[in-house]
């Protein structure tokens, strides 16, 4: 083997100590980075790749959720529009029904008023007829009494009885 003399090594050439610290640090840093990149680089790349895939998947899921939320919002808006339309229809039907009910109530009230007026007229007529009949009976009774009195004064008893009977029969027939 060939040995390098020690004097050559310590003379600044060869395997001696390098007294320039900056160059040494740069070389050491390059070696460390090279070792780190060669050994740890694959793991870091794999970690970054996995993180990238996770982020991409999260973004896709977020987009899907956003689309679903948009669809649900559209459905909710459609349902709201339908509900408002139905509410308007129900309100209109209620107004129509209320108007019909109002007309029906007015008609029934008018019919009831007409019926009450008719009953009132009938009652008045009945009471008038009853009063007329009572007055007629009283007039007839008074007339009969006066006739009896006149006949008693101017006629005999049998004649008086026969005239009274005939007059009473005539009066009864006329009623």
From Swiss-Prot:
<comment type="function">
    <text>F(1)F(0) ATP synthase produces ATP from ADP in the presence of a proton or sodium gradient. F-type ATPases consist of two structural domains, F(1) containing the extramembraneous catalytic core and F(0) containing the membrane proton channel, linked together by a central stalk and a peripheral stalk. During catalysis, ATP synthesis in the catalytic domain of F(1) is coupled via a rotary mechanism of the central stalk subunits to proton translocation.</text>
</comment>
<keyword id="KW-0812">Transmembrane</keyword>
<keyword id="KW-0375">Hydrogen ion transport</keyword>
<comment type="similarity">
    <text>Belongs to the ATPase B chain family.</text>
</comment>
<comment type="function">
    <text>Component of the F(0) channel, it forms part of the peripheral stalk, linking F(1) to F(0).</text>
</comment>
<feature type="transmembrane region" description="Helical">
    <location>
        <begin position="26"/>
        <end position="44"/>
    </location>
</feature>
<dbReference type="GO" id="GO:0045259">
    <property type="term" value="C:proton-transporting ATP synthase complex"/>
</dbReference>
<keyword id="KW-0066">ATP synthesis</keyword>
<protein>
    <recommendedName>
        <fullName>ATP synthase subunit b, chloroplastic</fullName>
    </recommendedName>
</protein>
<comment type="subunit">
    <text>F-type ATPases have 2 components, F(1) - the catalytic core - and F(0) - the membrane proton channel. F(1) has five subunits: alpha(3), beta(3), gamma(1), delta(1), epsilon(1). F(0) has four main subunits: a(1), b(1), b'(1) and c(10-14). The alpha and beta chains form an alternating ring which encloses part of the gamma chain. F(1) is attached to F(0) by a central stalk formed by the gamma and epsilon chains, while a peripheral stalk is formed by the delta, b and b' chains.</text>
</comment>
<keyword id="KW-0138">CF(0)</keyword>
<dbReference type="GO" id="GO:0009535">
    <property type="term" value="C:chloroplast thylakoid membrane"/>
</dbReference>
<dbReference type="GO" id="GO:0046933">
    <property type="term" value="F:proton-transporting ATP synthase activity, rotational mechanism"/>
</dbReference>
<keyword id="KW-0406">Ion transport</keyword>
<keyword id="KW-0472">Membrane</keyword>
<keyword id="KW-0934">Plastid</keyword>
<dbReference type="Pfam" id="PF00430">
    <property type="entry name" value="ATP-synt_B"/>
</dbReference>
<keyword id="KW-1133">Transmembrane helix</keyword>
<keyword id="KW-0813">Transport</keyword>
<dbReference type="InterPro" id="IPR002146">
    <property type="entry name" value="ATP_synth_b/b'su_bac/chlpt"/>
</dbReference>
<keyword id="KW-0150">Chloroplast</keyword>
<keyword id="KW-0793">Thylakoid</keyword>
